[in-house]
């Protein structure tokens, strides 16, 4: 009996958190309607689900959306760059659908304010983490696919990623944010950025946190399953901050 009560309490908390935000602007950005149950699921991060009675979370939709995204972008690149070798279009796709590319799209549609996060993630600014933004974006694509089918999901994806796809060749076949940040600093005649990293968790499931500093000031922070990816995320945040400040 108490187990059922806890479950209902979790569902009530889920509905209350979801209804506290107007999600219509997000749907307007996407250009499609998503039925309530799918939208709730797509926006429910595992931290919220775990803190409220082990509710369903968006990871299965993320898995599905990742597949739809990959195929949509791969086919578009195949058509748009007919003379590029497989190795180049493969790297273009990897850059476009990377965590950083997805997080950029998420920020453009203000996705962070719509994600249902647990208290721990809220305290650590989870709404601005590239990993959470990227995963939730893929979950939304999965939800659109489930409701509307592949063609509609593909059209939404290609519209959101149009600029990145059109400029994939011009930007180069990969994006190394540490190099990009250093080039920006060199252009401004600023000193080199410095990186530090720590890890937590068991050996088989370590989570790395990297911090990039410039002249003693923290410019970016990133997380990842290894030091390299964490530093890339931190460098990406630092690059955006530098561009925004025009320091």
Curated annotation (Swiss-Prot):
EC top class, as a word: hydrolase
UniProt xrefs under InterPro entries: dsRBD_dom (IPR014720), RNase_III (IPR011907), RNase_III_dom (IPR000999), RNase_III_sf (IPR036389)
Domain DRBM: 176-244
Keywords, in A-Z order: Cytoplasm, Endonuclease, Hydrolase, Magnesium, Metal-binding, mRNA processing, Nuclease, RNA-binding, rRNA processing, rRNA-binding, tRNA processing
GO MF annotations in UniProt: double-stranded RNA binding; metal ion binding; ribonuclease III activity; rRNA binding
Chemical reaction(s) catalysed: Endonucleolytic cleavage to 5'-phosphomonoester
Active site residues of this protein: 66, 138
Database matches in SUPFAM superfamilies: dsRNA-binding domain-like (SSF54768), RNase III domain-like (SSF69065)
Matching PROSITE patterns: DS_RBD (PS50137), RNASE_3_1 (PS00517), RNASE_3_2 (PS50142)
Residues forming coiled coils: none
Cofactor(s) in the UniProt record: Mg(2+)
Main location: cytoplasm
Location of the RNase III domain: 21-149
Gene Ontology cellular-component terms listed: cytoplasm
Tree of life domain: Bacteria
Single biological process term from Gene Ontology: rRNA processing
Subunit structure: Homodimer.
Family statement: Belongs to the ribonuclease III family.
NCBIfam families cross-referenced by the UniProt entry: RNaseIII
HAMAP family in the cross-refs: RNase_III (MF_00104)
Role noted for this protein: Digests double-stranded RNA. Involved in the processing of primary rRNA transcript to yield the immediate precursors to the large and small rRNAs (23S and 16S). Processes some mRNAs, and tRNAs when they are encoded in the rRNA operon. Processes pre-crRNA and tracrRNA of type II CRISPR loci if present in the organism.
Protein name: Ribonuclease 3
Organism: Corynebacterium glutamicum (strain ATCC 13032 / DSM 20300 / JCM 1318 / BCRC 11384 / CCUG 27702 / LMG 3730 / NBRC 12168 / NCIMB 10025 / NRRL B-2784 / 534)
Gene label: rnc
């Amino acid at each position: 009996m108490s187990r059922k009560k806890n479950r209902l309490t979790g569902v009530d908390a889920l509905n209350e958190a979801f209804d506290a935000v107007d999600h219509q602007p997000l749907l307007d950005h996407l250009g499609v309607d998503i039925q309530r149950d799918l939208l709730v699921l797509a926006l429910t991060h595992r931290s919220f689900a775990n803190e409220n009675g082990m509710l369903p979370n968006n990871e299965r939709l993320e898995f599905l959306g990742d597949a739809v995204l990959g195929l949509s972008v791969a086919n578009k690149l195949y058509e748009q760059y007919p003379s590029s070798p497989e190795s180049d279009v493969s790297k273009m796709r990897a850059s476009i659908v990377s965590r950083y590319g997805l997080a950029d799209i998420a920020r453009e549609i203000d996705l962070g304010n719509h994600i249902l996060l647990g208290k721990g993630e809220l305290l650590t600014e989870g709404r601005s983490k590239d990993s959470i933004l990227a995963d939730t974006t893929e979950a939304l694509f999965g939800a659109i696919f489930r409701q509307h089918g592949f063609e509609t999901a593909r059209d939404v994806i290609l519209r959101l990623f149009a600029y990145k796809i059109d400029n994939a060749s011009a930007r180069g076949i990969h994006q190394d944010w540490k190099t990009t940040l250093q080039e920006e600093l060199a252009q401004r005649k600023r000193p080199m950025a410095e990186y530090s990293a720590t890890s937590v968790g068991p050996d088989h499931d370590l989570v790395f946190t990297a911090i990039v500093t410039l002249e003693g000031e923290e410019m970016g922070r990133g997380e990842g399953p290894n030091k390299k990816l964490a530093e890339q995320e931190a460098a990406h945040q630092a690059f955006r901050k530098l561009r925004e400040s025009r320091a």
